[in-house]
Design a protein with these regions (language model features):
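N-terminal Sec-pathway targeting helices
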Residues: 2-12
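Hydrophobic membrane-insertion alpha-helices, especially the h-region
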Residues: 11-22
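N-terminal "domain-start" segment that seeds a small globular fold
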Residues: 27-58
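Short active-site neighborhood of thiol/selenol oxidoreductases, capturing the structured segment around
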Residues: 56-75
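Alpha/beta-hydrolase fold active-site loops
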Residues: 64-65, 96, 142
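Hydrophobic beta-strand core positions in alpha/beta domains
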Residues: 66-68, 100-102, 145-146
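Structural microenvironment flanking redox-active thiols in thiol-disulfide oxidoreductases
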Residues: 78-118, 127-134
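Thiol/disulfide oxidoreductase modules built on the thioredoxin-like
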Residues: 113-121, 126-171
Length: 175
């Protein structure tokens, strides 16, 4: 019992440090890779949207594309949706197109129901193993790529990110 009481201050200190790290975001799982100094061409892709219409990467040349790998069951992915809706409205006239690649295994019906309830204002395409591999494998979801008007990857982030922080990554690519 005395040993436990002697260690109590250390346990309290460890708990406080853990809480501070979590609150500061240092423990966040979001990872962003800056490609801005590189010319890394985004892979070409072609996928079907929820209406069965083909969407191809070459149709988006000249636009800034946010390509987000996600799933309806992913909590962090769902948390980012209101921000993406806001960014699509705010920057559409500057050439922004958000395209979300659903990795849901249950098929488009599940995704269609989710989209109808959430008010998403950007295209959703159904992903497959081919696009995941083309983008170097998806370490986790959400995984998001910012692709510039010339088709080069400028940013990659893994994990959820607050809208304001993501907008700071996006704005230089839109300019």
């Amino acid at each position: 019992m005395k040993k436990m009481l002697r260690n109590a201050p250390l346990l309290v200190l460890a708990a406080i440090i853990a809480a501070l790290v979590a609150a500061s975001g240092l423990g966040s799982k979001t990872k962003a890779d800056d490609y801005s100094d590189q010319k890394t061409p985004a892979p070409a892709w072609s996928l079907m949207d929820l209406a069965g219409k083909e969407i191809r990467s070459d149709q988006l040349k000249g636009k800034v594309v946010v390509l987000d790998f996600w799933a309806t069951w992913c909590g962090p992915c769902r948390m980012e949706i209101p921000g993406y809706i806001e960014l699509q409205k705010k920057y559409a006239d500057q050439g922004l197109t958000i395209v979300c690649v659903s990795l849901d295994q249950q098929g488009p019906g599940v995704v269609q129901r989710f989209v109808a309830q959430s008010g998403i204002n950007y295209p959703i395409v159904m992903g497959d193993q081919k696009i995941v591999e083309a983008f170097g494998g998806v370490e986790g979801i959400p995984t998001t790529f910012i692709i510039d008007r010339d088709g080069n990857i400028r940013e990659k982030k893994v994990g959820a990110m607050p809208t304001a922080q993501f907008e700071k990554l996006l704005k230089p690519v839109l300019e």
